[in-house]
């Protein structure tokens, strides 16, 4: 899921079109005072890298990065305008994930004042919480992440882990990770993205995942 602050531009692409390198350049040109965005941007998430496909000028450059995926990791390219061209560079090695992505309007009311009275959502604050996050990944057969790495990123302005905590037991019952496009590559469209949403399967509270999504949106809206 991508989280975007509204940007009013005469040359915005259609809503069902993925962003592209050319689109970023067009938006940047309209914002004459804007600093250039960082080309070829990616970030290490512990379980692998997320490549910001629309910061790569050529599809072949995306393929080249993906072909260097370390063993035991999962590198993913997001915002790829021409995935068929990327796949053509290594059709026996690369594959297209059929998952959809959605955009969330950050102008709407995101968190009710009374929401989550029995569950608090906070930024990850300890190594023990990082271990709990990795345990949630394992419960859902997600690629595991070294808790030490998660904890080492606790003060990062590019990547954030939020945890949902049961107010009574103080156990971590959910987690979500987000990437800030602005601090990562100076995104002229002021975007951000949600990754790795997971909730404890036997949690006694409902809508833990939704609460995490809403709090992450507020985090990036601030």
For the regions a protein language model found, what residue spans apply to each?
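Short Lys/Arg-enriched alpha/beta "domain-start" segment
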Residues: 2-45, 61
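A conserved beta-strand-loop-helix scaffold within acyl/acetyltransferase catalytic domains
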Residues: 141-198
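Acyl-donor-binding surface of acyltransferase catalytic domains
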Residues: 25-29, 47-118
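Nucleotide-sugar-dependent glycosyltransferase donor-binding/catalytic pocket residues
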Residues: 126, 204-205
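Conserved acetyl-CoA binding element of GNAT-fold acetyltransferases
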Residues: 40-57, 188-201
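Short amphipathic alpha-helix that is part of the acyltransferase structural core
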Residues: 5-6, 109-147
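Short coil/turn motifs at secondary-structure junctions
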Residues: 107, 181-183, 202
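Conserved acetyl-CoA-binding loop-helix of GNAT-fold acetyltransferases
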Residues: 58-67, 195-199, 205-221
């Amino acid at each position: 899921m991508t989280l975007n602050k509204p940007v009013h531009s005469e040359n915005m692409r259609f809503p069902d079109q993925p962003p592209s390198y050319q689109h970023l350049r067009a938006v940047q040109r309209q914002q004459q005072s804007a600093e250039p965005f960082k080309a070829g941007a990616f970030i290490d998430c512990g379980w692998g890298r997320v490549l910001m496909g629309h910061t790569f000028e050529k599809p072949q450059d995306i393929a080249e990065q993906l072909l260097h995926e370390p063993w035991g990791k999962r590198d993913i390219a997001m915002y790829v305008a021409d995935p068929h061209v990327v796949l053509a560079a290594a059709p026996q090695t690369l594959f297209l994930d059929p998952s959809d992505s959605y955009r969330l309007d950050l102008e709407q009311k995101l968190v009710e004042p009374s929401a989550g009275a029995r569950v608090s959502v906070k930024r990850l604050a300890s190594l023990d919480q990082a271990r709990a996050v990795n345990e949630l990944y394992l419960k859902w057969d997600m690629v595991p992440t070294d808790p030490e790495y998660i904890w080492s990123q606790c003060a990062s302005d590019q990547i954030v882990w939020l945890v949902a905590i049961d107010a009574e037991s103080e156990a971590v019952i959910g987690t979500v990770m987000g990437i800030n496009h602005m601090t990562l590559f100076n995104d002229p469209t002021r975007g951000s993205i949600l990754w790795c949403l997971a909730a404890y399967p036997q949690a006694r509270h409902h809508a833990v995942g939704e609460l995490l999504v809403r709090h992450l949106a507020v985090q990036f809206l601030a």
